[in-house]
């Protein structure tokens, strides 16, 4: 079964959106496999966003991510990377329709509440970085009611 990495950014944590966001993934039928509330340092944030290091917004992004606690999660399910991105919405909240997390809760691209892996390969890399100890090995009893 496919896995993805989802991070609720400091603005999402500060605004009390953690439960709402988790609920959206649970209601879709995805299984939570890992969950951490933590504050990361600059080196860790730079490693996570290394692929964006040449972008002009990189330093501001790193400062934003280290400004407060984040919630790091691993979700599992069929097509969870692609579907998770649809649940989240476009990177720019102005381009995210109502009903998506960013469409409902974000206004500015620099405070867009949530990060989600953009591909299976990046999900594996991000899960390895954020959860080096691994994730919970369990299956929901609801799987037969969700999957064919």
Curated annotation (Swiss-Prot):
Enzyme Commission identifier(s): 2.7.4.6
Transmembrane portions of the chain: none
GO biological process: CTP biosynthetic process; GTP biosynthetic process; UTP biosynthetic process
Keyword Acetylation: no
Keyword Cytoplasm assigned: no
InterPro entries xrefs: NDK-like_dom, NDK-like_dom_sf, Nucleoside_diP_kinase, Nucleoside_diP_kinase_AS
SUPFAM superfamilies: Nucleoside diphosphate kinase, NDK
GO terms for MF: ATP binding; metal ion binding; nucleoside diphosphate kinase activity
Family: Belongs to the NDK family.
Function statement: Major role in the synthesis of nucleoside triphosphates other than ATP. The ATP gamma phosphate is transferred to the NDP beta phosphate via a ping-pong mechanism, using a phosphorylated active-site intermediate.
Protein name as annotated: Nucleoside diphosphate kinase
